[in-house]
Amino acid sequence: MRIRARGIVAGRASGHALVSPAPFSFVGGADPATGSILNGATGGTGERLAGRIFAFPTGKGSTVGSYVLYGLGKRGHGPAAIVNRRADAVVAVGATLAGIPMVDRVDVGGLQTDDRMVVDAGRGTVELPDIQGKRVVTAILRNRGRILIVRRSEKVGTFQGKWSAISGHIEGREDPKHRAIVEVREETGLRAITLRGTADPVLARDRTTIYIVHPFLFDTPNRRVRLDWENVEHRWIRPEELDRFETVPRLVDVVAAVFQPSA
């Protein structure tokens, strides 16, 4: 699988991933002498950065972090490459000084520690040779402040019994918006829908598959849903109630994305 990225510091590197779900500061977050992770929020306390592709949402902390990262790289204890959702100036400066390849605009929520990765900042790509990517759409339907969720039937191929929004696979070079509208009509019978927003793709992980989820927000004037065979139950809920349900991977993040679209 290949993910598009934005190159920040030129270079190419390969290795196994070390993934943190939390923003990271090299000041206090890593041992400057050994490159061992100290920050428990990363989920990787004790892991060493050397030779790893370090993926985390963004950097934080003081400008001293640039020099900590530079020192790690100079002593051979720094990461082989850095992958971010959003590049932070402190990390970017440190990576530049240390000559560590760096990219951003990658949703690190779909990556896992020990994934085999190849980062090419010159081309703006991140490759995961052992992972299969599948492009899908997810349509969030909204009516009077509530959103529609559906429970998947036992007849579908994946995530049987889990709660989801309206979703479907993108075929070939099909336009994602067109596919989203088709799925809404087929799965709910609703036709008078109005597109209100989109967001950057969310990477939802299921073992060795990453679903590249293209999110859409539609308003609908009514709640008269007619389910097809793919789903067996539906509810209209407030977005903040979603965490009460057993959902498909990262549905909460997809909903958050369409209500707060990226710039």
Question: Where in the sequence are the language-model features?
Answer:
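A short coil-to-beta-strand element that immediately follows conserved catalytic motifs
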Residues: 190-200
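Conserved Nudix-box catalytic region and its N-terminal flanking loop in Nudix hydrolases
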Residues: 146-186, 190
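Conserved N-terminal beta-strand and adjoining loop/helix that marks the start
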Residues: 131-148
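Active-site-adjacent beta-strand/loop module that shapes the phosphate/pyrophosphate-binding cleft
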Residues: 143-145, 201-225, 235, 239-240, ...
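Feature captures the catalytic cores and cofactor-binding loops of soluble hydro-lyases/lyases
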Residues: 2-11, 17-127
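Charged phosphate-binding loop/patch that engages nucleotide di/tri-phosphates or the phosphate backbone
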Residues: 252-263
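Helix N-cap/coil-helix junction residues
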Residues: 77, 189-190, 247
